[in-house]
UniProtKB/Swiss-Prot annotation:
One of its GO terms (cellular component) is cytoplasm. This is tRNA-specific 2-thiouridylase MnmA. It comes from the Bacteria. The keyword Nucleotide-binding applies. The keyword Transferase applies. Residues 150-152, 310-311 are annotated as: Interaction with tRNA. It catalyses: S-sulfanyl-L-cysteinyl-[protein] + uridine(34) in tRNA + AH2 + ATP = 2-thiouridine(34) in tRNA + L-cysteinyl-[protein] + A + AMP + diphosphate + H(+). Disulfide bonds join C104-C200. The gene is mnmA. It comes from Vesicomyosocius okutanii subsp. Calyptogena okutanii (strain HA).
Length: 362
């Protein structure tokens, strides 16, 4: 941002939360021409019990009124359904566990949103993500946010050079505590607003309850590591690798009182394999991927780097190689717990996010 002209028009993705509120304030204080754009990505149910779009819009209006900046609104519900949600459902039907937030960033927040912002005259867009962008040798790099607990580069690893060139992350060099303090000092209604968790279209519902409205139940067996029948499940889509909560396996099974976890899904037999405690079947040292994406020039393989198989995981050392189909094979230095097909593995070189791929199998 240091090299930007003060006449630069920046449109902030204002969600009605504290992070985007402070983002708008910081840019305004730096003298830029700031406007805001609130986007709606999901049509609520008639009772409005789950989605908070109305309240979020009200909070966004409150912030823009306080800052005396213009607020635009746009409905991307159709785009979200076509580009994100349909893929989400297809993956769950296959028994996989997708991450819609990553696709939403690529297709909606830095896709449809960016395009619309430019049509409104924006030179750049800004969001409240905790990440950083650097330019080196004529190309843009995605860097981790300085607040390790809030770093969101994992969700942004599919951004293109063009998307990075048009984006700003003012919160990348700050931390959440300071952001809330700034919001409080400026009397923002969002100062103490709870951070959004989970997926926007699910809201406060149980995930299985939401999924059941779109996917038919398909009863199968829950079995132990030796194939012994334990109970029935209502569909593999309602479970994910490593899951503990919701299995509801009583005390009449197993040799100990240790909790049960999902270790595997057998799609062909429609079986859910469960184990007790910190079982070895929960750990794998290798995985294979599809759809590799590199933010900058693809590296020479094989190579050693760090990787994360889920958000907020501590980076893990690994070796990346390429198979005959040009897909990536990952070997970790240490076995990893609950490697989950459909999720993303994201690669790092210290604080630089290199890119990522989709986990296919272990």
């Amino acid at each position: 941002m240091k090299n930007l002209n003060k006449n630069t028009k920046i449109i902030v993705g204002l969600s009605g939360g504290v992070d985007s509120s402070v983002t708008a304030l910081l840019l305004l204080k730096q003298g830029y021409q700031v406007e805001a754009l609130f986007m709606k990505n999901w049509e609520e149910d008639d009772k409005g019990r789950y989605c908070s779009a109305k309240q979020d819009l009200s909070d966004a209006q409150n912030i823009t009124n306080k800052l005396s900046i213009k607020l635009h609104t746009i409905n991307f519900s159709v785009d979200y359904w076509n580009d994100v949600f349909t893929h989400f459902l297809k993956e769950y039907k296959k028994g996989r566990t997708p991450n819609p937030d990553i696709l939403c960033n690529q297709k909606i927040k830095f896709g449809a949103f960016l395009k619309h912002a430019i049509s409104l005259g924006a030179d750049k867009i800004a969001t409240g993500h905790y990440a950083r962008i650097a330019k080196k040798n004529g190309t843009y790099q995605l860097k981790t946010g300085l607040d390790n607990n809030k770093d969101q580069s994992y969700f942004l690893h599919l951004l293109s050079q063009y998307q990075l060139s048009k984006s700003l992350f003012p919160l990348g060099e700050t931390n959440k505590i300071d952001v809330r303090n700034i919001a409080t000092e400026n009397g923002f209604v969002t100062a103490k607003k709870k951070d959004s968790t989970g997926i926007c279209f699910i809201g406060e519902r149980k995930f299985s309850e939401f999924l059941a409205t779109y996917l038919p139940k398909q009863q199968g067996n829950i079995v132990g590591e030796q194939g012994q029948f334990i109970k029935h499940h209502q569909g593999l889509a309602f479970y994910t690798i490593g899951q503990r909560k919701g299995l509801e396996i009583g005390g009449g099974f197993g040799k100990s009182g240790k909790p049960w976890f999902v270790a595997d899904k057998c799609i062909e037999r429609n079986e859910l394999v469960v184990v007790q405690g910190d079982h070895t079947l929960l750990y794998y040292q290798t995985l294979n991927t599809s759809k590799p994406y590199w933010i900058n020039t693809p590296p020479t393989l094989p190579m050693t780097c760090n990787a994360k198989i889920r958000y907020r995981q501590q980076s893990q050392s690994c070796m990346i190689s390429q198979d005959n189909n040009k897909q990536l094979k990952i070997i970790f230095k240490q076995p990893q717990r609950a490697i989950t097909p459909g999720q993303s593995i994201v690669f790092y070189d210290n604080e630089t996010c290199l890119g990522g791929a989709i986990i296919e199998y272990r």
